[in-house]
């Protein structure tokens, strides 16, 4: 069973995301809008991973579930993006145990309960 739903605006080919715990939106339904993604994640108890600030706002307004990992750094070369994610992912997963919203910046992580 997956634990994380990766939004369409993120690359699916990140090494640490290449296992059964992660599912990419385009493999479910590439036509889904944000509300469909939100409802699927909520129904299936998945954490949404996205750069889309709309999920950040929905999480603040609607609460959990689902939890949201919001990637809040600008466009990077793919290798740099992968490096940032791989360097912080273990901490992100630990923070998700007690937090509902995680903001990943290029140089820090912010966790909100």
Residues of each region from the PLM?
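A general structural motif
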Residues: 1, 45, 65, 98-99
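N-terminal first-folded block
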Residues: 2-47
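Glycine-rich nucleotide phosphate-binding loop and flanking beta-alpha elements
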Residues: 12, 55-57, 110
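Structural signal for conserved beta-strand scaffold positions within catalytic alpha/beta enzyme cores
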Residues: 24-27, 70-72, 103, 111
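Nuclease catalytic cores that cleave nucleic-acid phosphodiester bonds
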Residues: 40, 56-80
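Acidic, metal-binding active-site segment of PIN/NYN-like and related structure-specific nucleases
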Residues: 45-59
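C-terminal structural segments of small proteins and small subunits
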Residues: 74-110
């Amino acid at each position: 069973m997956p634990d994380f739903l990766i939004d369409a605006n993120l690359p699916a080919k990140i090494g640490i995301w290449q296992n059964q715990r992660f599912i990419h939106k385009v493999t479910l339904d590439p036509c889904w809008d944000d509300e469909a993604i939100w409802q699927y994640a909520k129904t299936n108890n998945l954490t949404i991973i996205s750069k889309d600030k709309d999920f950040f706002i929905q999480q603040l307004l609607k609460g959990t579930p689902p939890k949201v990992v919001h990637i809040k750094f600008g466009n990077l070369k793919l290798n740099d993006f992968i490096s940032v994610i791989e360097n912080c992912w273990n901490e992100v997963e630990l923070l998700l145990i007690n937090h509902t919203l995680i903001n990943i910046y290029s140089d820090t992580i912010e966790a909100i309960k």
